[in-house]
């Protein structure tokens, strides 16, 4: 049990005038400290702003000076090399001349996951950079690659084995370091490290190949645009459903593909819809023809019922005759032999027609084709005339008139005169 007298004394001490004054003094000290800190921060900010303003005022001059120095340095570095080696020099750095008394050892490192055309072209450039090259390829382990770059499709052993089957590769170094060090170069007697000139950024540095470039042992290769492992993976992810259906069709199970039961049924439903669409598109013409035939059959049945058999037979007969006329005319015009028989206007035919008395106008193919329509009209009219031939012959038969005899005499006289003129 606590003594009540001691508790009261402590409370009195806290509430005494001296303690209250001390509390106010503490608050004053805090305020003074905060004010001084704010002033110091403002002074620092002003000084920084002044320095930045000075820098911004000097940047155009600095830029001109730096660009001029950089251009002079680039010109000096390029003039040190022969023309055939200038393309291998990295921008802003020197390039060492290759040794002549031994094979040149070039090192190219990379993940080489899903070995593709871009990898092959880069290794080919390394191998063909000099006449006598030994190409060494380094492959980092799965542990380092997954930590620094991300998950891979193939394991490090599979990637190393893939590179051994490439014709340009002479040696494969497994468990290669992520950043090449001078000790690693000495260990494997490497003359050049090959990669494209784009800075390769990591967590520690802006360019992991910068120390190698400063040593003059960096060989620049050209990157193949549009081809990379990331591009291949993005294509697969973009068409994920299509590749799933492809693997299901080849016998893969949903457990192997890590697909849920709902996703599999969804894909099968989409597959059936696509199959129905393709079937409908293929058979659309057949369906149209069948519907057209059905329409004509129904139409004929309705015409028979409404018109009767006699009118329907007459209607069908006229339509068939018209179709036959068109077909015969087309066959006549398409036949080359009959087209040769058509007489066309010429001076010889006109001269002969003057003595024969025939019509001098030439017959066109359409005129000859119209003969079929005339013949068909005669056939149609023959049936009607035959029925009334007996009665019409008795009533309409009249002897030839005198005008007809006069016309015949004139034509004979004209012919005899023309023959005499031709003989003279």
Swiss-Prot record:
Enzyme Commission number(s) from the entry: 2.7.7.15
Residues that coordinate or bind CTP: 111-119, 149, 195-196, 200, 223-227
Name of the protein this chain belongs to: Choline-phosphate cytidylyltransferase
InterPro entries: CCT, Cyt_trans-like, Pcy1-like, Rossmann-like_a/b/a_fold
Record's keyword terms, sorted: Lipid biosynthesis, Lipid metabolism, Membrane, Nucleotidyltransferase, Phospholipid biosynthesis, Phospholipid metabolism, Phosphoprotein, Transferase
Modified residue annotations for Phosphothreonine: 59
Alphabetized CDD domains for the sequence: CCT
Residues annotated as binding substrate: 149, 178
Low complexity composition-biased segments: 14-24, 381-398
Associated pathway: Phospholipid metabolism; phosphatidylcholine biosynthesis; phosphatidylcholine from phosphocholine: step 1/2
Subcellular location: Membrane
Keyword Lipid metabolism in annotation: yes
Physiological role: Catalyzes the key rate-limiting step in the CDP-choline pathway for phosphatidylcholine biosynthesis.
GO molecular function annotations of the record: choline-phosphate cytidylyltransferase activity; phosphatidylcholine binding
Lineage: Eukaryota, Fungi, Dikarya, Ascomycota, Saccharomycotina
NCBIfam families named in the record: cyt_tran_rel
Residue ranges, compositional bias (Basic and acidic residues): 45-55
Family the entry assigns: Belongs to the cytidylyltransferase family.
Region (Disordered): 1-70, 348-424
Organism field: Saccharomyces cerevisiae (strain ATCC 204508 / S288c) (Baker's yeast)
Location (main, coarse): membrane
Other information: Present with 3050 molecules/cell in log phase SD medium.
Residue positions where Phosphoserine is found in the record: 16, 346, 401
Superkingdom, natural source: Eukaryota
Biological-process GO terms, alphabetical: CDP-choline pathway; phosphatidylcholine biosynthetic process
Cross-referenced PANTHER family: CHOLINE-PHOSPHATE CYTIDYLYLTRANSFERASE, CYTIDYLYLTRANSFERASE
GO cellular component, one term: NLS-dependent protein nuclear import complex
């Amino acid at each position: 049990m606590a003594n009540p007298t001691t508790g009261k004394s402590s409370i009195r001490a806290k509430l005494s005038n001296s303690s209250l004054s001390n509390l106010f003094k503490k608050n004053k000290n805090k305020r003074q400290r905060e004010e001084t800190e704010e002033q110091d921060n403002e002074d620092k900010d002003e000084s920084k702003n002044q320095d930045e303003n000075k820098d911004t005022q000097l940047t155009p001059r600095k830029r001109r000076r730096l660009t001029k120095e950089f251009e002079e340095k680039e010109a000096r570095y390029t003039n040190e090399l022969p023309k055939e080696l200038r393309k291998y020099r990295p921008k802003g750095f020197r390039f060492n001349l290759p040794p002549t008394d031994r094979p040149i050892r070039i090192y190219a490192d990379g993940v080489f996951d899903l070995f593709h055309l871009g990898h092959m072209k880069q290794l080919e450039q390394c191998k063909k950079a000099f006449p006598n090259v030994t190409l060494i390829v380094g492959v980092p382990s799965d542990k380092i690659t997954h930590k620094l770059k991300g998950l891979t499709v193939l394991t490090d052993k599979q990637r190393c084995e893939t590179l051994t089957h490439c014709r340009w590769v002479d040696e494969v170094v497994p468990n290669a370091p992520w950043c090449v060090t001078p000790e690693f170069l000495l260990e494997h007697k490497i003359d050049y490290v090959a990669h494209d000139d784009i800075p390769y950024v990591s967590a520690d540095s802006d360019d992991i190949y910068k120390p190698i470039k400063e040593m003059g042992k960096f060989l620049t290769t050209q990157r193949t645009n549009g081809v990379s492992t990331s591009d291949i993976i993005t294509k697969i992810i973009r068409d994920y459903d299509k590749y799933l259906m492809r693997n299901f069709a080849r016998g893969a199970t949903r457990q192997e593909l890590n697909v849920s039961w709902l996703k599999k049924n969804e894909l099968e439903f989409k597959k059936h819809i696509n199959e129905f669409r393709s079937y409908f598109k293929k058979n659309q013409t057949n369906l149209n023809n069948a519907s057209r035939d059905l329409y004509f059959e129904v139409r004929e049945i309705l015409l028979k019922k409404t018109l009767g058999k006699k009118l329907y037979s007459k209607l069908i007969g006229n339509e068939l005759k018209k179709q036959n006329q068109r077909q015969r005319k087309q066959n006549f015009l398409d036949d080359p032999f009959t087209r040769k028989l058509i007489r066309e206007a010429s001076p010889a035919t006109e001269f002969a027609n003057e003595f024969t008395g025939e019509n001098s106008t030439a017959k066109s193919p359409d005129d000859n084709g119209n003969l079929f329509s005339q013949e068909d009209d005669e056939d149609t009219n023959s049936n009607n005339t035959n029925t009334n031939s007996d009665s019409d012959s008795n009533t309409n038969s009249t002897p030839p008139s005198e005008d007809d005899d006069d016309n015949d005499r004139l034509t004979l006289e004209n012919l005899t005169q023309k023959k005499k003129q031709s003989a003279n």
